[in-house]
Structure formats: structure tokens, C-alpha cells
């Protein structure tokens, strides 16, 4: 298959690589869309020792299962591969699994390729009326969604009268702001130091955007 391979700081190569090997009940997925995470950029610039070259980056993935009983199912990928046996996993908190791995870090290659292999428990079927281009954003959106859900539980509130401040208007910050609104928080503010980003975010997102220095006012 073809893949975009990280070869070293600021070096990528589009080249032939071996097709994924299916282990056990893993599914082969033909990739449709992959997001570019901030961690991919850190790796590309050589700032992430956890991602040594050569390596296929990319973990925000959606695509279509191409073999087996689920062939044709459109899916989005949970990139976190947990052991399934430790206390965290059996408690439903596999994100805290001490043996967790993630695609785009050795030994798991990432999604900037034509195909990837994943276990069915790491796949969520995408509705027919939802684009795979949008579905690849499920993983970054889930970060903010999970944080909002935990915060609401800690406050013991449904959203009425709560005001929320999100520090940073990058991808995860915007996802958190949108998750706050979707979960019933009506007063949401985002602080962002970059003026161009502030101007962009002020258009039709349902939350207010200010510069950090304006908080003192």
C-alpha cells in the first residue's frame, strides 16, 4: 500500500510499505479521512521522542471495513489500544490502562496510509447520513466531550446557570467549547492570544472569544 512516512524532522516520504497484518479478530479498514493532530505536527518537527522515524503518523481516522462479516461498514477509529484485562479496562476507563498503546506510536503504525488494521471494539459505525470526512474528527471532539461530562458530574449540575471558560482556541479548545454548548452550557467563553484565530472563531460558533488580557476587565 501507499503511505506518508515520517522520515525525520521535517521530512515526509510518500512511498510503498507493507500492508497491515491482521492479528486475531482485527478488521482491515480502507482509510477515507485522517485529521492532522497537534501531536502529528510535534512529531514532524522532531519534538516527540515517542514517535521516532521511520513511522506512519496520524491517529484521527475514518474509513470503511473491506473484509469479513462487517465488510462495507463505515467506521471511525478509537486510536487507543488497551489491554482489556486490567482494573482500569474492566472498570470502563481503558484510557487509563497502564499498557495502552496508540496508533502512530511504535509498535502501531498510524493512519496516513491506504489501510489500517484495528479490533472491532475500537471501531464505531458511522451513520449513512454523516460524512467520513467529519467522522475522523470524533477522536479530538471526544477529548472535550469527556472533559465536559466529567466537569458536569463533579458540579452535580445539568448546565443551568453555569458559565464556562475555555483557555485556548485550538482544535481541542474549540471542540471543548462546542461540547459545552451541546451539553447545555449556555454561557461559554474562549480565550485565545492569536488575533487571526480570534477573528475566525468569532463567526457563528455560539460562544464568545476574547484575548487573554481582556479577562482582567
Which sequence ranges carry the predicted segments?
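Nucleotide donor/acceptor-binding cores
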Residues: 1, 73, 161-162
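Residue-level recognition of beta-strand termini and adjacent short loop/turns
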Residues: 8-10, 23
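Glycine-rich beta-strand-centered segment in the early N-terminal region that forms part
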Residues: 18-34, 47-87, 127-129
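Cytochrome P450 core scaffold surrounding the K-helix E-X-X-R motif
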Residues: 39-45
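Residue-level marker of beta-strand positions
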Residues: 60, 73-74, 88, 94, ...
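NAD(P)H dinucleotide-binding glycine-rich loop of Rossmann-like/cofactor-binding domains
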Residues: 83-164
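Mid-domain Rossmann-like dinucleotide-binding core that forms the NAD(H)/NADP(H) cofactor-binding site
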Residues: 131-214
